[in-house]
């Protein structure tokens, strides 16, 4: 029997899902137990939805409601600074990555340029 991983989804996976990318739907289905996102991911997705008008904004809010929203705590902030310095990633990516690490979750992304390749980040597909 497989033990389900506790997942934290990167912004690109959620945007792919909202854009109808089948691989994103598969990943969200596979890691459906207690899925989480960073507050940064919530903000990034909602900024895009708000530009599309009230109907899509509401639909997106409802979609995001299925995820546990993890805050930027002091511990996440400290870890993000370390990751930003040591891994040379953009600050929003460092915060998302730190949120996963502090919460003992597997970060699921499809963008190796954001996180490198040998780093514990799961990249189930690429576009």
Model regions and ranges:
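Short, well-structured N-terminal submotif of metal-dependent ribonuclease cores
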Residues: 1-37, 47-61
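Alpha-helix capping/helix-boundary segments
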Residues: 13-14, 41, 76, 95-96, ...
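Short active-site oxyanion
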Residues: 33-35, 65-68, 101-106
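Acidic catalytic patch
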Residues: 65-86
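Donor nucleotide-sugar recognition loop
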Residues: 86-92
């Amino acid at each position: 029997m497989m033990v389900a991983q506790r997942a934290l989804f990167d912004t690109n996976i959620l945007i792919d899902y909202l854009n109808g990318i089948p691989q994103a739907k598969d990943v969200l289905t596979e890691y459906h137990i207690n899925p989480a996102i960073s507050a940064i991911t919530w903000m990034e997705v909602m900024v895009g939805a708000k530009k599309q008008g009230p109907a899509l904004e509401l639909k997106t809010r409802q979609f995001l409601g299925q995820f546990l929203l993890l805050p930027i705590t002091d511990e996440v902030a400290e870890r993000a600074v370390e990751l930003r310095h040591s891994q040379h990633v953009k600050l929003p990516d460092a915060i998302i990555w730190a949120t996963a690490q502090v919460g003992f979750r597997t970060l699921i992304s499809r963008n190796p340029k954001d996180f490198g390749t040998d780093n514990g980040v799961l990249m189930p597909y690429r576009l």
